[in-house]
């Protein structure tokens, strides 16, 4: 199992290598899903790859944002650079980037980013069919789904430690719609960490705990996971060192048959360096609802070290439960809020009283809890981790009348360098100890001397000659190690022309959830699409009977493999009634659907190469990303591809795997078997909302699957670009979600020109996303 560590900058990269990472993932200066990380410019990236490869650490580079048409040429330049410097893999989300990478740089290893929302075996099969060598699975996958996915023949990578996105991977538009900063383009403003009101209680209902699966590595290994990914490209180097070192030791122990769960000291260290809401074991290990979300706290919680026993003026006496050291960062949780300070005083042991000096603005009292946010000793330990030296053997041959020769090997690569002809000694001949003194001076190199053999007799060798030989051997062995670990140079093929397959014109579409919405929209568009609330077998059969012949079925964005099997069977069984299907995720292209299909909004498309890719895969139409502006749509629509444009409807801001209703009740088990909504329980999600600090109300809609519910967080207002899309001549996509019969009829009237306008927002039409 690969220990894959984050490297947001050079210091973090060095920390990862020092801590025992097998591979690192990092971002180039552009097109990375963590634009806020330091990332690497071109020269830094070249140096980083050489440095990592010298230490036999792989480098994965993220090019995993959605790309606009005007950026595609720049992305190809980046791919060319990554191919040239021979990075070990490139992570992508955008289908246009995937297509260009596979066509122009066929030898460049491509990994499916978690943003691609690959969440079942069918999705991994799609990745394999497209020539990708690894899939980073969505964080919501269960261990059973991971095991099925691992049988598809490519590597599986899972997130094992750190912060979690609360929305289903790749399916979040909240930051984009509310603030214009797109998470799909690396600029998420994290509205999930804000407070919202649910049923009158204000809390962080969208803020997940950090995950820690350090103790679950054997189960993940058994499931077929090839790489455990540690989150943290925005974290400090000391965090990277601490986490990567912990997982390094655990993986080594597992491989040696001596695995043990982390003891209290190690787990405390993991919590101390950074933990939000304590830790959860992740969806893979069965975390659910209140076990996923920590409504009480959105930031680093640290480790509790004691309570205030007495406070007066600028001083507090704290009874310690853990040792306290000079320089520790503390947080006192007072009635007025959290107060943070740096402890300056004597190191004090648990059980004793520590005197803490307070700033004038801090008001605390007896009983207030004190937490340590940073441990100075832990940080010093993390900084002290040295990059391991590379053990090397040397063999020196120095005989008079023959060239001086030094062979140096690390056990895999070997180099021999020669010097001038050796002269006979006139007085004192070179000894083995003389040679060791000169050749062993390796402190300014990545090597350490493991063994030295010297063959000599009566030779005079100047110290300067030995030093020169040592320098040349070290330099050549470093180059040999890099070359041995670096994949072969790849070829570049020219990009093909942007030519779309022959397809019918884009259809206008109306997507409905209910029978009354379907009645209102009947005949209003070329295609009527049914997006069920309930995907269980009985509900699908009865719901389809209420729909007109020729209706298209919208597939869910996320579902387990067995659910997709059941949907496949349902589609085949009802092929005579269904007009076709709308795919909910790109991974659903991993199986053959014997009915017409189109690409829905769950497959984000921002550029023409992505359109080309999906049409080549057999889609009859493609849905444009709702993050495109009107001007960007004009570029996308050049040459009139069969692209439908989101025109009316509440934007799905998030697709949640946890249920706010169950989280509110503190439930941590029983998600799949929950029947609160079915039984119309007063505690059910139906009709509930989240309200932000400004009073904006966001509806919550459930989507029932056999494996349990997903929850759709909808925008407060519908997008309404009916007039703009009509004037542009695009094929509109109308999406009805919360509309009742009258509201649905009003939407129809506006479409038919019988009403002038409806309430709504233009979304990004006049406001391009960052």
Language model segments and positions:
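Short glycine-enriched loops at secondary-structure junctions
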Residues: 9, 65, 93-97, 116-118, ...
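A short acidic, glycine-rich active-site loop
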Residues: 37
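Glycine-rich, highly charged phosphate/nucleotide-binding loops
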Residues: 40-45
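Short acidic/His/Gly/Ser-rich catalytic and metal-binding motifs that mark active-site loops
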Residues: 100
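Conserved nucleotide-cofactor-binding alpha/beta core module
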Residues: 121-122
